[in-house]
């Protein structure tokens, strides 16, 4: 990512030199402020390095590359199409990297802190949100795939206000089951809810408890936006032209 940032500002050699010389400073900032990203940034990945420290090492160069890449795209707008769309592909890559750091690197998918046990008709608080399990939904007929479906209807509240009703569940096949994910889309990212499929039998027998995994994924929109920008720009480059040099 540092190399990509340097390439983005290659027309300003002095800035490239300062950028490469600042690499030790980025490492120091990551070591001192790795915990400041929040979420699961304090979780240790190995060798005494936590998720936040690794995230900052990638995030700072990506943020530095963002304005430079936008500037290159603007300079080529309305000129030769291939360089313009090529810079848009690079812009999409930068956005994807930033979103990946925020929604994946600093989020630990395997920790028990994301497991929430809900009691029917009672609100349970988790990380500023409240979840209320209201009913179990079952379906065996009319399914496009699978032999049966079991879902839990859950109201999601923020600051005491209902923001959405979701239904994470389990899709059953003859030999195995598959969790069906539901999510709440917000301006900062997605709140993803996954039901633990091992409790399907107890819910079918009338249990008032449901166990879900909850992941608050900030910046996930940047992942999808960056991916879409890269795909559309690539298609635009491949489109036939009357003049192959355009």
Predicted features and spans:
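Accessory, solvent-exposed terminal regions and/or long lumenal/extracellular loops of proteins
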Residues: 22-30, 94-245
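Contiguous transmembrane helix-bundle modules in multi-pass membrane proteins
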Residues: 1-124, 219-246
